[in-house]
Amino acid sequence: MAHKKGASSTRNGRDSNAQYLGVKRFGGQVVSAGEIIVRQRGTHFHPGAGVGRGGDDTLFALQAGAVEFGTRRGRRVVNIVAAAAAE
């Protein structure tokens, strides 16, 4: 049996905190103003109509309606459409 730990074991033993990133409200889901739609690092998704962007690139709803994912000029965008129009 080893009587010393070894060099690597004393250097390990730490982990980063979970970031909880990703899409929080999917296409077709109805949201109210202020709800977070996507948590991201960088602009993987860009804000469209009725969507704002926070300082950490989080996308959130500026108005109530249904979430709609699409593309514009080759970029993925998130829009909010009127809930009645989405049904």
From Swiss-Prot:
Keyword Protein transport: no
Domain of life: Bacteria
Any single GO BP term: translation
Pfam families registered for this protein in UniProt: Ribosomal_L27
UniProt keyword terms in alphabetical order: Ribonucleoprotein, Ribosomal protein
GO MF annotation: an example: structural constituent of ribosome
Gene3D superfamilies linked: 2.40.50.100
Tagged with keyword Ribonucleoprotein: yes
InterPro entries cross-referenced by the UniProt entry: Ribosomal_bL27 (IPR001684), Ribosomal_bL27_CS (IPR018261)
GO CC annotations, alphabetized: cytosolic large ribosomal subunit
Database matches in HAMAP family: Ribosomal_bL27
Family statement: Belongs to the bacterial ribosomal protein bL27 family.
Protein name as annotated: Large ribosomal subunit protein bL27
Species name: Paenarthrobacter aurescens (strain TC1)
